[in-house]
Structure formats: C-alpha cells, structure tokens
C-alpha cells in the first residue's frame, strides 16, 4: 500500500487534507500517522528533500527548483503558479471539500497556500483554510508576512481558522521553543482532524455533508484566538 507512490490512500474519498510548506506538512504528516479514515492526504512543498522525508504517499512539488522558498512568500507564490496544472490534477479526483493547512510567515505556506485555495475554490470545492500565525519572538517581519498571507488566504476560502501561536503559548505556559512549534503543528492537526471526523464518522455526529457546505459556503473568516495581546 505504502509503496504505491503518488496514489491517494482512499481513491474515492471526497475530503482532502492538504499540508502546504513546513508547518502544514508537519501537521499532515502527524495526521497521516494517526490514521484518519475517509480522508486523503497530500503534502505540497517547494523543498524536494522535505517531501522525500514525508510518510504521506501523495506529494506535490511546487515549482521546478526543489530548493525551498527561503522565507520569501513571493517565491512560494510563483512556485505554486508554476505548478497550477499539477494542483488542478491533484484536486480532480472527486474531492468535494478540502482543508488547506499551513503555517503563515515563511515562504511556501504563506505564498503557495492562497494559490492552492484559489484553484480549489475555482473548481467548486468547499475550501477551508487552517493556518497559524507566528510567535512574537519570531519577529515583526515574519508576523507582517503572516498577516499578509492570512489576508490573501481569506479571499480564496469558504472558511478560515486562524490559530495564534502566542495565545497557544499562554495556554501551554511550560513550553520550550521546540515544544511550542510541535504544539502549533499539533493544533493544526487537531483542527483539521476534528472537522473532518465530524463529517466522516457516521453515527457519532451524523452531520450531513450538505449541512456543512451550507454552514461554510462563503462564510467568511472565522478566527480562533485572535489578537496579539
């Protein structure tokens, strides 16, 4: 099964979770390892080495260089634009809803996630963004880049969950730097996992897919734990 490179695990799954860049990719790697059913996973990155290291079978290299985006969102955006046909092909397998998850602030997630969201929405897929905003100590430049990315993302999704890492840190006060990053990835995983499981675990909460569509369609921006207080 795992040797079947490039094939989604569940060929007929209508829900796809897409990790873009480092943070989003880590979140999707974690979810994949947890073995969530009825959902297919894809990791997208400009860094070919990071993709090779992912356990997820379906991987999409953005752009032709394979060297990462060096914290430059414009580079991430151009790489995604270069790979538009691949992005469309990845979404053309009967996907009806997707969760596009990314850490905002770096190059690939910030630049490429909004492009993938745009393609998804143009294809009529119910598109949900789940993104994190950096920690304050990561610096103003990164936070400004992240907020620009969130703004761009919000134009191309039906719903957007924004997870503020500083708020996260106040909740988990004993976190070291490394743990804080892991926890942010974990929160991305939990958010995507809980929404997808609400839809797919029949009998637990029998929420009809059309109900979800009605709730989320062009529902604007839903922000979890906002502000830099």
Please provide the spans of the model-predicted regions.
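Tubulin/FtsZ superfamily GTPase core signature
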Residues: 1-229
């Amino acid at each position: 099964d795992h040797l079947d490179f490039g094939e989604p695990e569940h060929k007929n799954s209508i829900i796809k979770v897409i990790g873009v860049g480092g943070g989003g990719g880590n979140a999707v790697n974690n979810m994949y390892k947890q073995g969530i059913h009825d959902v297919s996973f894809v990791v997208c990155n400009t860094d070919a080495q990071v993709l090779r290291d992912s356990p997820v079978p379906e991987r999409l290299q953005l752009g032709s260089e394979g060297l990462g985006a060096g914290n430059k969102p414009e580079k991430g955006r151009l790489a995604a634009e270069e790979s538009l046909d691949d992005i469309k092909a990845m979404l053309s397998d009967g996907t009806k809803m997707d969760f596009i998850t990314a850490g905002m602030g770096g190059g690939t997630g910030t630049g490429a996630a909004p492009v993938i969201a745009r393609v998804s929405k143009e294809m009529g897929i119910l598109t949900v963004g789940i993104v994190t905003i950096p920690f304050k100590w990561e610096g103003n430049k990164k936070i400004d880049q992240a907020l620009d990315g969130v703004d761009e993302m919000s134009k191309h999704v039906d719903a957007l969950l924004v997870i503020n890492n500083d708020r996260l840190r106040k909740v988990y006060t004993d976190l070291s730097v490394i743990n804080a990053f892991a926890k942010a990835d974990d929160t991305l995983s939990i958010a995507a996992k809980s929404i997808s499981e609400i839809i797919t675990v029949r009998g637990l909460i029998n929420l009809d897919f059309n109900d979800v569509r009605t709730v989320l369609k062009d529902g604007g921006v839903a922000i979890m734990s906002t502000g830099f207080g």
